[in-house]
């Protein structure tokens, strides 16, 4: 199975830096999950409606990591991580 290359939006990079300082354990969980996604990005749930070009994975019960897949360049672009309600605007 091919391994996709990672891309990370600058907004997410900033959130990950803050998470690294505030909650090292959750940071490590996120990084491990990102590695898993790079190995098989199509395993995760595609979104619908306004977010139909994106996929998501729950990091824990409340937090969601959003990403997109670029098949041509074999890149997974990690876009955002936030509380479920903020991601979906609930």
Across the structure, where does each feature detected by a protein language model lie?
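A short, surface-exposed loop/turn module that caps and links secondary-structure elements
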Residues: 34-58
């Amino acid at each position: 199975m091919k391994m996709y290359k990672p891309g990370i939006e600058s907004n997410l990079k900033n959130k990950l830096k803050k998470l690294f300082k505030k909650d090292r354990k959750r940071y490590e969980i996120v990084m491990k999950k990102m590695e898993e996604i790079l190995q098989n990005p199509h395993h995760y749930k595609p979104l619908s409606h306004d977010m139909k070009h994106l996929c998501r994975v729950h990091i824990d019960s409340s937090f969601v990591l959003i990403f997109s897949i670029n098949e041509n360049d074999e890149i997974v672009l990690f876009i955002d991580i936030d509380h479920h309600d903020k991601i979906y605007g609930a």
